[in-house]
Amino acid sequence: MRSFTYQYKGETVESLWAVSVEKGDLRYKVKLGPDLWLTIVPTFVNSTGDKIIWLQSNKEHEIVQPHDLVQAMGEGIEVFLEQ
């Protein structure tokens, strides 16, 4: 089972949820609060090989990019996948 950590207000926090598989794709889930969780979908850009991490909040019901999440929440959150 894979885990990940994320940065919140300068503090490194370990994931509170495990990994789930939906439609054959990995979904990394983290719980940020009692009623707020994020689904993180790692995707790769074929042309460059760069990893793009998408975040889906159960509050917004839409997939956003990290900078969109930071703008929406007013906090800096960075997610780091650990193999």
Region spans (language model):
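Residue-level recognition of conserved beta-strand positions in structured domain cores
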Residues: 17, 30-32, 41-42
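Alpha-helix boundary/interfacial micro-motifs
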Residues: 26-28, 50-51
